[in-house]
Regions:
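Mid-domain alpha/beta scaffold segments of enzyme catalytic cores
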Residues: 1-258
Length: 258
């Protein structure tokens, strides 16, 4: 039994065969999925999808790429609160900082990041954090806003060991994607070895970051098993032991009843 803790099932990539994608995940032993909103409308779609399946949950929030499109932050805050009150919503996000593409100015990204951390704290929900080429600002804001009050996860982790250790010290989980299966991922392998198993999550970030052996094709939740197999190999444990522990981790963070 495995959980894909971060996928984007509402994206147009899945429009033609979404039901089949979900069924393939179930057939592959994926017991639960969390589909992630990237803006207000996508968050609404994520909730609607989750409400149609007992084993799918949703997260709501504003991706740093989309932060630039928000003109009325107070209204957005109220809307996120309302969406987050829905039964199938288990986290806020994804939110955070992306300085690689800089689709939104850094100061706007930071403002929305702080907003969503504080919303998460007020709602008692964990926060799903996106951080790319923004290590120092990400860690600084997480510390200043006391993320440990509500908890959360660094999704699709691409940082270094120092970042991982500081995140762990703030009570965060670290989530690994299909990147861990790539040939050039030795740095990530070393980080996986060093992190306690009870603080690791796995994800696909589908339709992105497809793991080997399907790299280059569209990703989907069924493929999270390849990430799980690689981490089990790195840790020197059975896939069954890994699956049980990581499922327990996800249930604990997202308050899931499994």
């Amino acid at each position: 039994m495995l959980i894909d803790t971060h996928c984007h099932l509402t994206m147009p990539d899945f429009e033609a065969d979404r039901s089949a994608v979900i069924q393939r995940a179930i057939d592959a032993g994926i017991s639960h999925m969390i589909t992630i909103g990237t803006d207000i409308e996508d968050s609404k779609r994520a909730i609607a999808l989750a409400e149609g399946y007992e084993f799918i949950y949703a997260a709501v929030g504003i991706h740093p790429h989309d932060a630039r499109d928000i003109t009325d932050i107070e209204n957005v805050s109220d809307t996120i609160k309302k969406l987050a009150s829905k039964k199938k919503v288990v986290a806020l996000g994804e939110t955070g900082l992306d300085y690689h593409y800089m689709h939104s100015p850094a100061e706007i990204q930071q403002e929305h990041f702080r907003l969503e951390i504080n919303l998460a704290k007020s709602l008692g929900l964990p926060v799903i954090v996106h951080s790319r080429e923004a290590k120092e600002d990400t860690l600084r804001i997480l510390k200043e806003e006391k993320v440990e009050v509500t908890g959360g996860v660094l999704h699709c982790f691409s940082g270094d060991m120092d970042m991982a250790e500081k995140a762990l010290n703030m009570g965060l989980y670290i989530s690994f994607s299909g990147v861990i299966t790539f040939k050039n991922a030795k740095k990530m392998h070393d980080i996986v070895k060093a992190i306690p198993l009870n603080r690791i999550l796995i994800e696909t970030d589908a339709p992105f970051l497809t793991p080997v052996p399907h790299r280059g094709k569209r990703n989907e939740p069924a493929y999270v098993k390849y990430t799980a197999e690689k981490i089990a190999d790195i840790k020197g444990i059975s896939l069954e032991e890994l699956g049980k522990t990581i499922t327990d981790n996800a249930a604990r963070l997202f308050r899931l009843i499994i």
